[in-house]
């Protein structure tokens, strides 16, 4: 979870510097790392070739299957993770930049997502 929290902090700094694509990338990875930590903490993650966190699509699918559909996390958290991935695709692979408002919203949502994953799956671990 520490990696997710660091990425969240980086996203906020990049946003304040006006780097909307960089902020969007870091916010997405904050959520990716938090989702992966939640899967591992829940016993649904694996290390190695079966690790759902090896790819974005694998992680999103595993998160939806094992945590959202089981009711361990809300559907809203699943939607946020999917939206973050969509915005990162624009930030990293499209000629146009992410809109400033979308980047702001994503950074805010990443902070909420990481906090929710920590509270639900790693409440006793120290925050970074």
What spans do the regions from the language model cover?
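Terminal alpha-helical segments
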Residues: 1-128
């Amino acid at each position: 979870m520490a990696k997710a929290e660091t990425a969240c902090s980086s996203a906020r700094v990049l946003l304040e510097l006006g780097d909307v694509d960089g902020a969007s990338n870091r916010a997405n990875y904050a959520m990716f790392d938090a989702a992966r930590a939640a899967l591992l903490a829940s016993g649904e993650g694996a290390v190695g070739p079966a690790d759902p966190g090896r790819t974005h699509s694998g992680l999103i699918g595993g998160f939806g299957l094992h945590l959202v559909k089981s009711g361990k996390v809300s559907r809203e958290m699943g939607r946020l993770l999917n939206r973050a991935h969509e915005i990162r695709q624009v930030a990293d692979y499209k000629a146009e930049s992410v809109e400033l408002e979308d980047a702001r919203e994503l950074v805010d949502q990443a902070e909420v997502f990481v906090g929710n994953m920590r509270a639900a799956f790693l409440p006793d671990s120290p925050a970074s």
